[in-house]
Structure formats: C-alpha cells, structure tokens
C-alpha cells in the first residue's frame, strides 16, 4: 500500500536527506586513489553520526556495511572491504541511507577516481541526467510507469543497458516501501502519483548489457559482460507543483 506522508513526516525526511547529502559531499572530497572501500565506509559512518543521523543500511537485511560501495563492473550492494583499493580511473558507486528521528532518506552517487575516458564520463553524466528526466514527470496525475518511460526514452538513444532486476521504491519510516519503481517501461501504468508521496528514484545504467548477476558474497551485483555501471539516486516528494528533492543541499 502506498502511503501519503504528513507535512511533519516530510520535514523529518528532509532533515534525514540533508544529513545524507552532506555526507555524500564529504565522501566526494574524501575519495582518492590508494584508499579502500572500507575506509570510505568508516568515513561515511563517522560523518553521518557527527551530523546526528544513523546509517540505515547497517544490518538492513543483514548487510554487513554502513554504505553500499560498488566499483567498476559492480552495479550495487558492494560490501566495503579493506582489500578493495581504489585506483586511478575507477568508477565507484556510493549508495547510502540515513535515518533521522525514525524517518529515512536514500541516495546514491557515482564518482570517478582521478581521470578516466570520455566514454565513462559520459556514462556517469547520462545516468545522472536520466534521473532528472524522470523527475520532470513526477507530478500529480501521472503514473509510476511514466518514470520508467522517461528514463528509457533518454537512455535508449545511447545504447546503454538499463538494469531491470533492481528498481526504485517508496520510502518513509522504512527504507523500502510501496510502490515499486521500475527504471524501464512496463505493461502496467502503476499507481497514480499524488501529493506527499515520497519516492526513491534510482536509475542503474550499464555501459553494455543490462544483464547482471550476484557474486559469491551473495550481495554484490555485477554486470554479466564485465563492463562498468553507473548509479544515481535521490529521495523526492511529490508536491502540487514541481517535485522536490529531499536528498540534496
């Protein structure tokens, strides 16, 4: 069941989103060649706590880290590791959640470590752009499937693979709530968008095939062709007019 949030609930989610956004900004400055994904995870945890929040992903479904940190062909759900060291040219996805006074925010960013090819730069930029294409249709009266249509129509012109096995979701007191939000076109329109619905929209775009698999650690999702993937996500709220992003500052 899709819940409609009160104004008070939305303000708490906005507070959670501010903490998460500031943490993402701090992580962007922290990333450099030679550090491990474990280093990033501990830095993220420390930053979230310093800002007054809690890391939502820690032990969520028994996930062992604070943030999901995925490198290169890893799409999502990468487990932070002391042995996974960043190198020049890596593409790293940071996906995290923050809980503040019982309410959640969820956002992901993709960073390039140092310099890389224009091909990878374009993938990262276009993944982010696809989120903002989706944001344009997040108005009352439209349907959930309009989000997938917007992402697909934008991404298909570049020939990338849109991950279908993992999707966006509603969010509120829980990280994952109804409705499910595919990043691709489905046969069903899905629920109607209404004022004060809160959604986590998160296109996951692969340079090559859309096909993915889960690694032996039972968490990390990787591309089947070994090519890089990019991920961009924000928590938003539907309003009477334009939607608002709750996870930026």
Identify the residue ranges that each predicted region occupies.
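Active-site neighborhoods and metal-handling regions in enzymes and metal-associated proteins
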Residues: 1-249
């Amino acid at each position: 069941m899709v819940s409609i949030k009160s104004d008070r609930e939305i303000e708490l989610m906005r507070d959670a989103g501010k903490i998460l956004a500031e943490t993402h900004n701090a992580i962007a400055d922290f990333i450099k060649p030679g550090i491990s994904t474990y280093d990033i995870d501990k830095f993220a945890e420390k930053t979230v706590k310093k800002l007054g929040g809690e890391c939502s992903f820690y032990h969520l479904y028994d996930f062992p880290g604070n943030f999901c940190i995925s490198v290169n062909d890893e799409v999502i759900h990468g487990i932070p590791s002391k042995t996974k060291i960043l190198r020049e040219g890596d593409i790293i996805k940071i996906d995290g959640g923050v809980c503040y006074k019982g309410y959640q925010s969820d956002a992901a960013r993709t960073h390039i470590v140092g310099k890389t090819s224009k091909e990878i730069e374009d993938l990262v930029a276009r993944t982010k752009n696809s989120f903002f294409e989706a944001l344009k249709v997040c108005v009352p009266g439209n349907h959930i499937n309009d989000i997938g249509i917007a992402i697909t129509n934008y991404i298909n012109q570049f020939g990338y693979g849109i991950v279908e096995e993992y999707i966006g979701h509603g969010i509120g007191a829980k990280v994952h709530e109804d409705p499910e939000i595919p990043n691709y076109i489905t046969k069903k329109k899905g629920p109607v968008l209404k004022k004060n619905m809160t959604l986590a929209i998160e296109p996951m775009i692969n340079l090559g095939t859309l096909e993915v698999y889960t690694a032996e650690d039972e968490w990390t999702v990787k591309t089947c062709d070994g090519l890089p993937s990019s991920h961009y996500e924000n928590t938003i709220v539907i309003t009477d007019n334009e939607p608002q992003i709750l996870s930026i500052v």
